């Protein structure tokens, strides 16, 4: 059976506290070969690192401060995250020239800008995002980017570092064709597409094949949020990424196996891992 990768799932969320092990088992049974775990602050960074140790070779952690978590203490949060980042950097013989600097962390994320609910910490969000973009440049870990109601500001900031960045994912893409084309102008980045693509009202099934090449998409759930049809309204989980894959394969007019294969290759290109291990 072919496998798929869920490139964005919050398995550390409290919604999984009652059945986390069972949810992992369901993901594996459904054909999910790997799960990538974004962090949103210091606490969740520790949590996803712990899950990666519990599920080695299956769960892969990230590190970052989510824009909605940028509050009055954001500088202290970033300082603590920077300390964790340094603790996980390989040194000496373990770090060979041209090889990844980290044995476990696969991305800086979930980071970005979010002006949807409030612009109270707008300036602080920009500062925190830019600092973490610099971490990506320095470490060459890709970015997992969250952006709502701030694409212009995000694009402006990323242009400053475009040539130095290793790439990344524009997570939870739900925009139109013009917005997709603007994001794809960052040629080392891909679009993360999830459950919204399965909604009856979604335009993504038409817009994505029109302007987004197959080699510029990765699959995600963003669980426990935004469950795909036929689970809409319920708690989302990684096993449901298969529904996203089926929907998009049909939209692109190719087999589910070919769509899974290509999106796995895309994940391998962006993140420091080998698809041969999936």
Segments from the language model and where they lie:
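Mid-domain alpha/beta scaffold segments of enzyme catalytic cores
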Residues: 1-278
